[in-house]
């Protein structure tokens, strides 16, 4: 951590690395419009407070997707442990919605949209090893 910014974010300079720990997202198209999110823990929100929901909504709104989607999120990454579990789930949702509805977005396109969900979500779209600076974007 380099410093705390006036907007509440921390300015960072760090190496980020993906690891073999993951949650499971399963997506299916629905004929009824909307986002139907089910999570395996009752204390995790399944509405617009959830980053998976936000990611799905972001793309579905932008591309005016008329169908709905059913998303099942099974959490294995510890919640609020600083391991980017929510961010990686959001990234997976972006990739999944892009594929499911054949939106044709590239990885770069997804990364550009991902920053609207969270600072480290673009990295989670990219995966691998990266130097993160600024607020982590």
Predicted regions and their residues:
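ATP-binding N-lobe of GHMP and related small-molecule kinases
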Residues: 1-81, 99-108
